Amino acid sequence: MVTAEGVREAARGLEGVAVRTPLIWVEPLKAYLKLESLQPVGAFKARGAFTAVRRLPESARSRGVITYSSGNHGQAVAWAANRFGVRSVIVMPETAPAVKVEGVKKWGGEVVFAGRTSADRLAKAEALVAEQHLAMVPPFDHPDVIAGQATVALEIVEDLPDVETVVVPVGGGGLIAGVVTGLAAAGSRAKVWGVEPVGAPKLTRSLAAGTPVKLDRTASLADGLITLTVGAAPFAHLLAQRDRLAGVALVTDDSLREAVHFLHRECRLTVEPSGAATTAALRAGDVRPAGTTVLVVSGGNVDPKFFED
């Protein structure tokens, strides 16, 4: 389990590396946005990926790193590896958005395509680990990744000590697990809402079952939130802070699309559907935040053609 000191150590390790992203007030939403879309790779994933790569033993890191990702975590691992001057291999789905594939290549990552599901990507990544002795950097199911994501919450509390609600998108659970852990480390009493697509209700199902549930299939406009399950480590952290969870909302693709356009039109922000999930949930009335509220905008890697719709 990630400790408060583990979160603070991650924050120290990210100083001068990750962007200390701002909070901006959006009057129509009556909420603040935490703009993780401003990270060097355009997503919060920079925090967890860099922390995990930094904490690897030098003997392992020097052989190169590998991950499996639909996009943003892959870009983050490639970026982190680039900063350490080591090789990175990113296993991506055949359906990965071009903007995310190019983002990986921008940081020197070697792209390997494998199927369409996270299981396809994981199998290929594990095979490459065995063949090439690369160090695996999981996208969400690892305490170092969770510790890095927890620094989002530390910054929120430092900038907004009276925060009462934080709304977080949910893919594999690394970010929401990090946020609940980071809020606890900061001594905040804020509650957390999770948001996931209607077509990928893995956290909703898992909380109901009391254990991580693997879905047969997922589908959503929010490609970063369609993992088949939440990770065991994130789920354990959520259960440890169960009283902090206010609820989990489900959003439709129509709501996601509207939220992306709203943020572009009203805030001049370029946000991908996964990053707009929190705004979508609030605008659709799917979350019912109490008091001072922060919506985490998790990423901004979206194809410009999206705005031609």
Predicted regions and their residues:
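PLP-dependent amino-acid enzyme catalytic core
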Residues: 1-309
